[in-house]
Amino acid sequence: MSTNNALRVFWKSREWNMKTSTFDSDEDILLLPKRKRFRKKKSRPVRHTKRHEEEQVYEQGTTLPCSICKHEIDLTGIFLHKKQHVALATLGFQWMGRKKPQPSVIAVQRQFMISKLLSSFMFTEKTLQSINNAFELLWKKQIPAYYKIFDNIDRSVIYSQKICHLLIKGVGICEDRNSTWKADMNDKFTVVSNFGNKPNVCFFGLFDGHHGASAAELTSMELPVLLLHQLSKFDPSYQMTTDEQQIINSFYTVFREEYAAIEDLFSAINKTEAVRCEYEDTHKAFAKAFWRMDRLLGLGRKEVSRVQWSGCSAVTCILEGKPKSPYAHKNWKRKNTHDGLAESSPSQEMPKIISGILHVANTGNVQAVLCRNGKGFCLTKEHTTRNTNERRRILQNGAVISSNEPYGLVEGQVKTTRGLGFHGNLKLKKSIIPAPQTISVPIDDLCQFLIVATNGLWEVLDKEEVTALAMTTFHMYKETYCPIIPNKSPSKGPLLFSTSEPNLTKSQSNIHVLFQYKSVSEVRVSTTNSKENLSDSNYSKYCIYNPENVETFPAETTHRKPCSEKVTDRPTSVNDVATNEKESDTKSFYEGAAEYVSHELVNAALLAGSRDNITVMVIFLNGSEYQLLT
């Protein structure tokens, strides 16, 4: 998505004739226009000021371009709008701008589609039901229930994260249970600063629980320690504490010698490959840690059901910061993939300034999007029945995908095809594998922010819409809440310039993949037997390695420390030096901005009709500093 499209998201006032109110019932609101004496109010108690500001924000309507038709759509109607796209396609209509076909035309087209279906050999009850559902959707007039959405929005919780990292300006996390649709909150997250006792190395993890929160909770606590143990095996700079090592040793009986021997065997096979990357060991560490975590979840700790144990989707990120140095001695060949990423191999020169490396591993439907130069890049793979490669693997493995809309469920249970846990159902576990998709990308001064979110956000908004909305809300925060921003160095140019400018090469508008394990769709492995799993040559290609330990979190680990929902003004001490005050003000600004953007993305997902738990993590990088100058 170009920068111009990103800035097309705008806020406009709604003509709702709604006044700021603290009434408890809808009846009082309906009588409001007749009670003219309320117009004479000029002041409001101080205790209502914050609530008044929030209601003013919600009285504004946010619109963003639909990723399908590019028309400006109100957030409250985007869920229905996308369903209408599907319904029109089902009935064979072409999109006609904002005009919807007349009811008589819709009825005639329905009869035509049914007649055509009956005369063919493709007739099924499911296809007939899809046609009828599309007809009902286009025939009826939908009226959104705003009052329900407003009540739900007020329940979001924001967490503040203090991070000391040369690449990170601020981190904010917001979550919402989405009480309209979900009774429990199954999302968990983890943030570890100075990961492995290394400065400028941070760990971020987000875990979306399925059938309960037990698996997600255990994974959020133990997976970072498992990963640290694997990294410390080949990189001594990653250090473990005594307590962490003791916890690792406590799982010795879970990972016996034969288990480690099989992992070492396939690790050695991979090492004989002709082409080897600098970050291959890091990717193997991710794979081993995921496999070991899955094995630990098989112990059934904290599980209460005898039939269906919990599982989780997971995304883990390690951000390594390095002093800026030219990479003139390395050349890279750029090759675009279908995701818009640029694979790198020796040949063509890549940007000479790289300030860090981001390693990402994911299983399931938790996604991470990196915004670079105003364009969003998805760094994760969606492991659900929507993915054709995953569907093929599931079916070839002998599993059944139900006929549930829109893409079916694995064994009629879940739509995720990879994840951690799910051990209670042996038939289901045979198909859901813990094999992570891993990737490493460079982080430079053009990288603005990283958004990591659970399925609750991505089921209603795609990466282009999320990126555009995040950039817009960041500008809103700057203009509305922080009118006075510390002066930035004039030597830094604006980041949000048009991608058509001559000073921006095509290679600079993409990101370069330093290393990536490719998913193999022909995986046919059962995860119930560790020896069989690890001995499969196809599977060892990307996911099996020597895990042997578990650790507890170091002191820098952050676990759900709530903060105030709005952090807009954090004055520094008068005794500080001027430069320290400037740095502190800048840090406070970005921390508040990250919290604000994460909160607005959660609200947008609720308004757009999300039906799942929502957790959004926003990480502002150095590139966001350039954005302030636009």
Swiss-Prot record:
Occurrences of domain PPM-type phosphatase (ranges): 170-621
Family of this protein: Belongs to the PP2C family.
CDD domains, alphabetized: PP2Cc
Organism, scientific name: Homo sapiens
Region (Disordered): 557-578
InterPro entries per the UniProt record, alphabetical: PP2C, PPM-type-like_dom_sf, PPM-type_phosphatase-like_dom
GO cellular component: cytoplasm; nucleus
Pfam families on file: PP2C
Entry's Gene Ontology BP terms: negative regulation of MAPK cascade; signal transduction
Classification lineage: Eukaryota, Metazoa, Chordata, Craniata, Vertebrata
Cysteine disulfide links: none
GO molecular function: protein serine/threonine phosphatase activity
Record's protein name: Protein phosphatase 2C-like domain-containing protein 1
SUPFAM superfamilies, per the entry: PP2C-like (SSF81606)
Biased composition (Basic and acidic residues): 557-569
